[in-house]
Amino acid sequence: MAAAAARVVLSSAARRRLWGFSESLLIRGAAGRSLYFGENRLRSTQAATQVVLNVPETRVTCLESGLRVASEDSGLSTCTVGLWIDAGSRYENEKNNGTAHFLEHMAFKGTKKRSQLDLELEIENMGAHLNAYTSREQTVYYAKAFSKDLPRAVEILADIIQNSTLGEAEIERERGVILREMQEVETNLQEVVFDYLHATAYQNTALGRTILGPTENIKSISRKDLVDYITTHYKGPRIVLAAAGGVSHDELLDLAKFHFGDSLCTHKGEIPALPPCKFTGSEIRVRDDKMPLAHLAIAVEAVGWAHPDTICLMVANTLIGNWDRSFGGGMNLSSKLAQLTCHGNLCHSFQSFNTSYTDTGLWGLYMVCESSTVADMLHVVQKEWMRLCTSVTESEVARARNLLKTNMLLQLDGSTPICEDIGRQMLCYNRRIPIPELEARIDAVNAETIREVCTKYIYNRSPAIAAVGPIKQLPDFKQIRSNMCWLRD
C-alpha cells in the first residue's frame, strides 16, 4: 500500500507571516490526497484562490482640478511618490525640441522657497532620493523616502513643479551639462540606433525628434520657453500623483488638495491635441567600416497602449525573445531565433522590443553583428517573423504567455516599480489594470491569435531600418522589403 506523507515545519515567526489565516493551509501529498495542518481547514480551492488574489487595492480619486491621485498601500516602512505628467518631447515642435528634457534638469536647481543647496540638504537629511526623467510622451518627477516622510516628499514635489525659479545663471550652467550628456548618449550605440529608427519611421513628425533636442536648440532655449512649456502642459487633467509602499490614500489625498488645490488649473479651452505621427517604411544607414560591430534595428508599425492587439504583440515579442553570447546554450534554448543564432554564430546579441505610444508603436528587433554576418542574421530574423505569421505552435505560445506573465510580475518588486506602473497606467488607460485581468488577457492569446495579429502588422508590411557601423553586406531596402512575405508557387 502506497503511503504519502508531508511534513511541514514552521517557526512561530513564519506562522505569523501567513497573512492572518495562519491556522489553515492546504498541502498536496505525493499520492495526491489532501493534507491539512492547523485548526481550521480550507473548504475549497476557491477559498485558496481568493487568498492568492488578495493583493493591495489601487485606489484612485480625481480632484476638481483634474489631478488624479492613485495609490497602493502595501504597509511597507518606505514609499515612492511621484508626479506623472502627460508631456514629453512629442508635444514640442522643431523650434523648442528639447524643452521638456531641459525642464527636467532645471527641476532641482532651486525654488522660491528653497535654494539648490537647501533642497539637496533636505533630501539627504531625510535619507530620501529625488529623481526625474523625460520620455517622448511623459515627464516624471518622483521621490523615494520613509513612509513617515510622505508629507515632506509631496510638498517638495509640489514646490518643484510649481515654484521653480528657473534662474538665468542656472539655465546657462545647465546647457553645458546637457551638451555633455548628449556626447555620452552618442557613445551609446543602442540609443543612437533607436533615435535613428524613430527619425526614419516617423519622418518630419514629433516622434521622429530626439528627447534631448538638437545642439542648436539646447544652446538657444530661453527661460521664456521653459515657462511657456510649464504653463501650457503642466495642468491638472494631465497629471497623476501616484504613490506606492507604506502610504495612506486618504492622507495622500489631503496632501494633494493642500499642496496643489486649484493651482494646477485646467486648460483654457481644449487640451492641446497630440500631433499625429505617420509611420513611414524607410531606412537610415550610417556606414563606418572602422567600427568593430554593426548595430541594426528593424521594426514595423505596431499599436498604441490601449489597442486590443497590444497584448498579443507583447506575447509575440516574448516569443522572439532575446539572446547574448554570454547566455551560452544551443539547440535547447526556448527561443527559435536564439537557437538559430547560436547554432550559426550569427550575432553577438539581439533583443526584441515592443515600444508603444498613445496611438502608434514600434515592434521589432535590435541586433549587434559582425560585418560578415549582417545579411544572414537579418534573413533569419525575417524568416522567423514569417513563421510567426504562418506556423507558430501552441506550445511556443504557451511558453511565451508564461514567460511574459512571470516577467511582468517580477518587475513589480518594490515600491518604485509599482509606483511607476501606477503612474504610467493611469496616464495610458486612466485606470490601473488588475493583475488577474491582465493575466486573463494574456491567457486568451493562442497560436491562431498570434498568426492573425502578426499577419496584420508584420506580413507584407514595409519596415523601418536603422543601421550603424560596418554594414556593407546589409541588403538593400528593396530586398529587405521583399523578404517581409513568402511567395508561394
From Swiss-Prot:
GO biological process: mitochondrial calcium ion transmembrane transport; protein processing involved in protein targeting to mitochondrion
Active site: E104
UniProt main location, coarse: mitochondrion
Presequence extent in this chain: 1-43
Outcome recorded upon mutating R175H: In MMDS6; exhibits temperature-sensitive defect in presequence processing activity, when tested in yeast
Record-annotated site: Required for the specific determination of the substrate cleavage site: E191, D195
One GO cellular component, as annotated: mitochondrial matrix
Activity control mechanisms: Binding to PMPCA is required for catalytic activity.
InterPro entries cross-referenced by the UniProt entry: Metalloenz_LuxS/M16 (IPR011249), MPP/UQCRC_Complex (IPR050361), Pept_M16_N (IPR011765), Pept_M16_Zn_BS (IPR001431), Peptidase_M16_C (IPR007863)
A Pfam family the protein falls into: Peptidase_M16_C
Subcellular location(s) per record: Mitochondrion matrix
An example Gene Ontology molecular-function term: metal ion binding
Keywords, ordered alphabetically: Disease variant, Hydrolase, Metal-binding, Metalloprotease, Mitochondrion, Neurodegeneration, Protease, Transit peptide, Zinc
Gene3D superfamilies reported in the protein's UniProt record: Metalloenzyme, LuxS/M16 peptidase-like (3.30.830.10)
Effect of mutating R175C: In MMDS6; exhibits temperature-sensitive defect in presequence processing activity, when tested in yeast
Domain of life: Eukaryota
Residue sites binding Zn(2+) per the record: H101, H105, E181
Claim: Zinc is one of the keywords in the record: yes
Its EC number(s): 3.4.24.64
Function recorded in the entry: Catalytic subunit of the essential mitochondrial processing protease (MPP), which cleaves the mitochondrial sequence off newly imported precursors proteins. Preferentially, cleaves after an arginine at position P2. Required for PINK1 turnover by coupling PINK1 mitochondrial import and cleavage, which results in subsequent PINK1 proteolysis.
PANTHER family (alphabetical): METALLOPROTEASE, MITOCHONDRIAL-PROCESSING PEPTIDASE SUBUNIT BETA
Subunit note: Heterodimer of PMPCA (alpha) and PMPCB (beta) subunits, forming the mitochondrial processing protease (MPP) in which PMPCA is involved in substrate recognition and binding and PMPCB is the catalytic subunit.
Family: Belongs to the peptidase M16 family.
Disorder this protein is connected to according to its UniProt record: Multiple mitochondrial dysfunctions syndrome 6: An autosomal recessive, neurodegenerative disorder characterized by basal ganglia lesions, cerebellar atrophy, and neurologic regression in the first year of life. Common features include truncal hypotonia, lack of independent ambulation, poor speech, intellectual disability, and motor abnormalities, such as ataxia, dystonia, and spasticity.
Name assigned to this protein: Mitochondrial-processing peptidase subunit beta
Origin organism lineage: Eukaryota, Metazoa, Chordata, Craniata, Vertebrata
